């Protein structure tokens, strides 16, 4: 970079935009700034960065944060509450994601008259409904990922995008109909569009969460995690939630390799759909 003591907003296919110049390097002259907005195909998404060495202030009436990250050090999120507002001020889209792991959820079309008998498909449907729907509307900034690991041909992953999905209603049967239709489509490792806002692939847990970690800050919801009331949440959070049985030890190890934070919503073990509602409630109050 032209000035190693400056923080920049970096956009794909766009010139560098200097925010401000630091008077002194925060992590030494040999380290480059790591404060960047990356712009994937559609939405500008914030890359997690090191929040322990940063400044906050005002420039042209806007809140800004600055920081540098040693090249050898893993990126972490900033603990600055101004980041979501900063991100929106420069045209970014702060999004939310939910990954629901269904260890026994069927991976072939199933009967809509027996959702619990389809590997507790009812749990995944309720989580999807609570993640996407509000009164008389849908959350356009939410993506739901369903990982189905039941018989007969696991794994299968289903993606539902709030800003694209059509003709979906909050009831379990309707959501299940969209999932059933997705399972009837032949697919490979790449996402294949089923219809508006619904995609399917054969990604397993590690492939899926590695892909999601490029776009989201992964948060694993677990009773023994950091209390949500004391936690500083990263931008673009994606919450990983187990089904009625939770995650296996092996799955937990995979998730924890990519997780920025292990978060507790309650000391009690909650229903999966309750976790979705509480996470939304907390982010709504923070105006994420």
From Swiss-Prot:
Principal location: cytoplasm
GO terms under biological process: tRNA methylation
Gene3D superfamilies hit by this protein: 3.40.1280.10
Entry's Gene Ontology cellular component terms: cytoplasm
UniProt keyword annotations, A-Z: Cytoplasm, Methyltransferase, S-adenosyl-L-methionine, Transferase, tRNA processing
Reaction equation(s) it catalyzes: pseudouridine(54) in tRNA + S-adenosyl-L-methionine = N(1)-methylpseudouridine(54) in tRNA + S-adenosyl-L-homocysteine + H(+)
Region entry Unknown, spans: 1-94
Sequence positions that bind S-adenosyl-L-methionine: 221-223, 242, 265-270, 275
Stretches for region Methyltransferase: 95-288
Compartments in which it is found: Cytoplasm
InterPro entries listed in its UniProt record: Alpha/beta_knot_MTases, TrmY, tRNA_m1G_MTases_N
Origin superkingdom: Archaea
EC number(s) recorded for this UniProt protein: 2.1.1.257
Keyword NAD: no
Annotated coiled-coil segments of the chain: none
Pfam families the record matches: Methyltrn_RNA_2 (PF04013)
GO molecular function: S-adenosylmethionine-dependent methyltransferase activity; tRNA methyltransferase activity
Job description of the protein: Specifically catalyzes the N1-methylation of pseudouridine at position 54 (Psi54) in tRNAs.
Family per record: Belongs to the methyltransferase superfamily. TrmY family.
UniProt xrefs under NCBIfam families: PRK02135.1
Self-association and partners: Homodimer.
Protein name: tRNA (pseudouridine(54)-N(1))-methyltransferase
Native source organism of the sequence: Archaeoglobus fulgidus (strain ATCC 49558 / DSM 4304 / JCM 9628 / NBRC 100126 / VC-16)
């Amino acid at each position: 970079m032209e000035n190693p003591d400056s923080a920049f907003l970096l956009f794909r296919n766009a010139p560098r935009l200097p925010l401000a110049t630091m008077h002194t390097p925060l992590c030494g002259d040999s380290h480059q700034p790591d404060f960047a907005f990356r712009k994937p195909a559609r939405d500008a998404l914030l890359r997690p960065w090191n929040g322990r060495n940063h400044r906050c202030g005002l420039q042209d009436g806007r809140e800004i944060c600055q920081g540098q990250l040693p090249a050898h050090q893993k990126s972490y999120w900033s603990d600055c509450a101004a980041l979501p507002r900063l991100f929106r001020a420069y045209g970014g889209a702060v999004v939310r994601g939910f990954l629901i792991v269904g260890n026994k959820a069927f991976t072939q079309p199933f009967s809509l008259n027996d959702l619990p008998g389809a590997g507790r498909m009812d749990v995944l449907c309720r989580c999807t409904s609570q993640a996407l729907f509000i009164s008389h509307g849908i959350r356009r900034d939410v993506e739901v990922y369903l990982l189905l690991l039941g018989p007969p041909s696991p794994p299968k992953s289903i993606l539902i995008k709030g800003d694209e999905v059509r003709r979906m209603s909050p009831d379990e049967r309707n959501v299940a109909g969209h999932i059933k239709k997705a399972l009837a489509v032949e697919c490979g490792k790449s996402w294949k569009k089923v219809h508006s806002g619904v995609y399917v692939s054969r990604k397993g847990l590690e492939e899926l969460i590695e892909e999601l970690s490029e776009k989201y800050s992964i948060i694993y919801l677990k009773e023994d995690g950091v209390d949500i009331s004391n936690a500083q949440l990263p931008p673009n959070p994606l919450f990983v939630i187990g089904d009625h049985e939770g995650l296996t030890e092996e799955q937990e190890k995979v998730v924890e390799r990519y997780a920025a934070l292990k978060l507790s919503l309650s000391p009690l073990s909650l229903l999966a759909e309750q976790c979705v509602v509480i996470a939304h409630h907390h982010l709504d109050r923070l105006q994420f």
